[in-house]
């Protein structure tokens, strides 16, 4: 199976060698092009030199011009050639040599978008939220599932995903809308509304770990709140119950594992998420 790979980079001098190694060791796929959109920083020249020596493709973006949607859209429109494009972020670590094969195999003209399983190796709250949001069973979602699932029907991730490029081009990708987050969710809703399916591929795994401070978490959810206000097409889908369900899931699992740091952190963590989201929605109105 022939694929292209897109991996946006920022200040990636220390990671670039391992990123390329992990991509090139993938099995059962023929990698046609590896494309690195590079947001300019002080170490960009060294990163670009390494990319050139590795025979990969790149283009540069000024920091003030970067957007999650437009940068990926440019890669798809102007640089990719294969029907299937795997997108991955620089902090998603691929340990399984068949990860790209699993996620690329899930994509076709009827299922034009798929996202993989993310694993956190830090025993923090994210460890449990990953377990909840990225289960052990692969599944597909289509329009008939939306009423039951609500906002979760459009859950998606740009950390590790695959696109069927012919349809992406045909329907206009992210519609040339600049987005600093959730472009994957925007696209998932778009294809489901048009009668296509999205897929979650549990066999396609990456390690993707964070350890956000409460301030960082608040800012992240503040930005999410702003985004949802700017995209009112999501207003009709309930999300409160899923948030409460996630909090109770983390509490139960942390209690079962006697994870005291997580139990102490849980209330301020969830409060930071809630207040950030609420403030973001209020400010942007």
Predicted regions and their residues:
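Acidic donor-binding segment of Leloir-type glycosyltransferases
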Residues: 23-60
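Glycine-rich, basic loop-to-helix element that forms the pyrophosphate-binding segment
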Residues: 62-80
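Short beta-strand-to-loop acidic/aromatic patch adjacent to the donor-nucleotide binding site
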Residues: 82-93
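Conserved donor NDP-sugar-binding/catalytic core segment of glycosyltransferases
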Residues: 97-128
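Short, flexible, basic/aromatic active-site loop/helix in glycosyltransferases
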Residues: 133-154
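Acidic donor-binding loop at a coil-to-helix junction in glycosyltransferase catalytic cores
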Residues: 180-187
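Non-catalytic, C-terminal membrane-associated alpha-helical segments of glycosyltransferases
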Residues: 219-226, 230-231, 236-285
